[in-house]
Amino acid sequence: MLTNSLALALLPLTLTLANPLPAPAPADTITIANAGISAADTVPNSYIIVYKSTANDGQIKKYHGEILAKLGKKPVAEFNINGFKAANVVTDAAGLAKVGKNDLIDYIEKDAYVSVSPTTNNTKIFSGPSAQSLVQQPSATWGLGRISHKLRGYFNYIYDTSACQNTRTYVLDTGILIGHSEFQGRAVWGANFIAGSPNTDEHGHGTHCAGTVAGANVGVCKKGTVVAVKVLSKTGSGTYAGIIAGMQWALNDAYARGMQKRSVFSMSLGGSYSSSVNAAVASVVGYGIPVVVAAGNSNLNAASFSPASAPSAITVGASDFWDYRASFSNWGPGLDVFAPGVTILSSWFTCNTCYYYLDGTSQATPHVAGLAAYLIAKEGLSTPTAIVNRIVSLSTKNQVVNALTSPNRIAYNGNGN
């Protein structure tokens, strides 16, 4: 593992010594857990310090006081998610060397960029006087048809009338155009972690994903609520620290509303492998809320990406209309299920009646997040373990072509033939 160290400059000796002096002891080194990450992927001079599970709040507060004394500034963010305790410190390598050695620290990571999973098919924008004029049930999207039938090729969506009623799906993304006609008042603004940005979607990705979760015509959940948690900018990018902050806020919000057993996190985003992001996901799941994440669009093993590699997450790959694994979809034994992710029509951010086609594991993920909320409402499932087990047991087996080492499952709600 690479390490960062401070170089010591020694003045040249002018004396000639018969026996050379021993080399000076090296300066304290700070081990960085993800030191091998590409420099292009890292947020300059930003680190996530993760504390040991034994560190208590008083000890951490004292340590943060030491950071203030040594650096002249406090951590820019502090995290406490069900035993996952961490801080985001902005400083250079010299500053990190001053504060990065403490018995409370479990590990330190470089903060890094995350982004929406890139999409490959932006074919057409639709607009009309109302959502009803665009698509009506039973004339549903092929994705809704696929997750409600054992066989491919259907365009009618079969679902229970509970339809995710009294559930909240937190969409951690670029925000949501909450006034879009698809949501019928069931989209609400939650929190914004992009400094200086407005409380709306400036990119489109979040609105598209939210529509697949809860759109009246293009969504899984006809009666469910989606909550905008803006952690990605108008360029579709964000940071590890911002993602963790968004998860912490959403968890606290769900508990404050007494909705922790009726909530789901949908995270169609990703970056390089991160122990801290995966640990934060595990903490949210440990607190009783399922976290559904995109496998990623690099046609690589999802184990190299986060949060896709988080063992406690429900990791979703993308399949197409013909049940082939999408050519871009990440794969591997860490996936839980595939879902429709090619040529997916959903709500768009440019107007309240606009729609757009996108491809990606980002589009597959909200199908499964919606399914998780659907099962909470329909079957009364109340734990992440029960939800993922039910998704796996219901799934259509051995239909994905070229699943590689992934579990061969397609998401299914248990209704149509």
Model-predicted regions and their roles:
Residues M1-P24:
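Fungal secretory targeting signals
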Residues L21-A39, S53-A55, G65-G143:
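Autoinhibitory propeptides
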Residues Y47-V50, N88, Y107-E109, R168-L172, ...:
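Structural recognition of the beta-strand scaffold that forms the well-ordered cores
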Residues K52-D57, D92, Y113-V114, G175-I178, ...:
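Acidic glycine-/aspartate-rich tracts in secreted/extracellular proteins
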Residues K110, M247, R257-T350, N389-S395:
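Catalytic-core segments of hydrolase enzymes
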Residues L134-Q137, Y154-S162, T200-E202, V293-A313, ...:
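Active-site-adjacent substrate-recognition loops and nearby beta-strands
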Residues S139-A140, N156-W189, S197-G242, G258-V264, ...:
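Subtilisin-like serine protease catalytic core
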Residues A210-A214, K222-K234, Q248, N252-D253, ...:
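Hydrolase catalytic cores
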